[in-house]
């Protein structure tokens, strides 16, 4: 019984991953990011987050629904398209835009990578990295790495906080793989401590933790504010 449950769980996970990649490929150019598939006994909801939702017409959604049913056995899929809040901080969007940019102009890959890296950082990212691997110049395949800001790939941050994406640029010499990694501004970094100014300190909050420290802090604030007025 347990083995059947595990087998079904793995099959569902594989179905989700393969269908997500298929949707991104089918809707290439619409800058699809996150794809959520919610399976219920009545209907299967497919929620697609896109940076260009207007590109996904009702006709296109209907055709995609038929393909998902035929290829993946997803019965009665209902497709919903939602906009992305900040496309410049989305790894999937940046990876696709860069891949399509390189396809249009293979010689401009360095300039494009630098431009998108600046776009990510200007959007408020803590750190970002773009890696391009393939045969873009010369006979042999090479790897180019572009990095900005503070990007940590290990530990809790590397496991839970990084937004990663992979895309492929289809070129005449072959294909080029594009990896994009972004550490977003709202990421929780354990070893970064923010200090509040005296005006921002709440005595009520400190009292909940330690009344003695709250009393000392109250006296300090009174002295600080008095000195500031003088």
UniProtKB/Swiss-Prot annotation:
GO molecular function: rRNA binding; structural constituent of ribosome
GO terms for cellular component: cytosolic small ribosomal subunit
InterPro entries to which the protein is assigned, alphabetical: KH_dom-like_a/b, KH_sf_prok-type, Ribosomal_S3_C_sf, Ribosomal_uS3_arc, Ribosomal_uS3_C, Ribosomal_uS3_euk/arc
Keywords: Ribonucleoprotein, Ribosomal protein, RNA-binding, rRNA-binding
Limits of the KH type-2 domain: 43-95
Gene3D superfamilies in the record: 3.30.300.20, Ribosomal protein S3, C-terminal domain
Pfam families tied to this protein: Ribosomal_S3_C
A GO biological-process term: translation
NCBIfam families in the cross-refs: PRK04191.1, uS3_euk_arch
Quaternary structure note: Part of the 30S ribosomal subunit.
Function: Binds the lower part of the 30S subunit head.
Family: Belongs to the universal ribosomal protein uS3 family.
The protein's name: Small ribosomal subunit protein uS3
Origin species: Nanoarchaeum equitans (strain Kin4-M)
Name of the coding gene: rps3
